Curated annotation (Swiss-Prot):
The lineage of its organism: Bacteria, Pseudomonadati, Pseudomonadota, Gammaproteobacteria, Pseudomonadales. The gene is ssuB2. The keyword Cell inner membrane applies. Belongs to the ABC transporter superfamily. Aliphatic sulfonates importer (TC 3.A.1.17.2) family. It comes from Pseudomonas savastanoi pv. phaseolicola (strain 1448A / Race 6) (Pseudomonas syringae pv. phaseolicola (strain 1448A / Race 6)). Keywords: ATP-binding, Cell inner membrane, Cell membrane, Membrane, Nucleotide-binding, Translocase, Transport. This is Aliphatic sulfonates import ATP-binding protein SsuB 2.
């Protein structure tokens, strides 16, 4: 038996609860008896190999997919941002932001949301004229304008170049701090998960393989004490073997490059 409860009050804690949730396609259980809580205002990153159930879980939380059994409790006010911005090409940026909303002050609300993501000057721009990063920021504004208590992010940075990705990381953190939704970020990037999240959970075969608290001060950097130990643990859970030689040679070079990019992005 499946139970879905939509919550429209911010006083309920935690706003996201899953109890013994199952989602299956034919005989295959993609989500297999999952228990999970996400607290109000908590930023959770979700890792897992391809086919582990990450996107199915996000679609379930977004209301785009049903569960077969178990209990699922989520806020009514939810929004999802996907890897593809999914903008309507024949509508301007501001009309994409308020797509599907029936509100009197639609343009003003859209302009406020676009201002928050740094795109006030692109209010009337059409998707074909936007860069990849700009299009993704419009998609993010579309989520924000709905004032979600739960913001779902399905690999929204995967198609962006390194510098744009770092800027988007900082934008997401700034907006999360301002609006305080619970956030679930689906990603394949272990470093991204550690940099952004309060917790990192790992799915394997539709089950919770681990739930790791990231107790590192922000602003985070891969050179912080404790970062590499969390990284190694997560990579191990994902079946990636790390060798001392790799850590001593390849990773420092990568970390220096990423650190330099972050300094450059923050300086602009």
């Amino acid at each position: 038996m499946a139970t879905l409860e939509l919550r429209n009050t911010s006083s309920v804690t935690p706003p996201v609860q899953l109890r013994n949730v199952v989602r299956q396609f034919g005989p295959q259980r993609v989500i297999d008896g999952l228990d999970l809580d996400i607290a109000a205002g908590e930023f959770v990153a979700l890792l897992g190999a391809s086919g582990s159930g990450k996107t199915t879980l996000l679609r379930t939380l977004a209301g785009l997919d049903d569960i077969d059994s178990g209990e699922l409790r989520v806020p009514v006010a939810r929004a999802a941002v996907f890897q593809e911005p999914r903008l309507m090409p024949w509508k301007s940026a501001w009309k994409n932001v308020v797509l599907g909303l029936r509100i009197n002050d639609a343009k003003a609300r859209a302009e406020a949301a676009l201002t928050e993501v740094g795109l006030a000057h692109r209010l009337n721009a059409f998707p074909a004229t936007l860069s990849g990063g700009e299009a993704q920021r419009v998609a993010l504004a579309r989520g924000l304008v709905r004032e979600p208590k739960l913001l779902l992010l399905d690999e929204p940075f995967a198609a962006l170049d390194a510098l744009t990705r770092i800027r988007m990381h900082q934008l997401i953190i700034d907006l999360w701090r301002k609006h305080t939704p619970a956030v679930l970020l689906v990603t394949h990037d272990v470093d991204e998960a550690i940099l952004l999240a309060d917790r990192v959970i790992v799915l394997a075969d539709g089950k919770l393989a681990d739930d790791i608290r990231v107790d590192l001060p922000r602003q985070r950097d891969s050179g912080q004490a404790g970062f590499q130990s969390i990284r190694s643990r997560l990579l191990g859970l994902l079946g990636v073997k790390t060798q001392a030689a790799d850590t001593a040679t390849q990773e420092p070079a990568r970390d220096v490059t990423l650190s330099a990019l972050r300094r450059f992005a923050n300086a602009r």
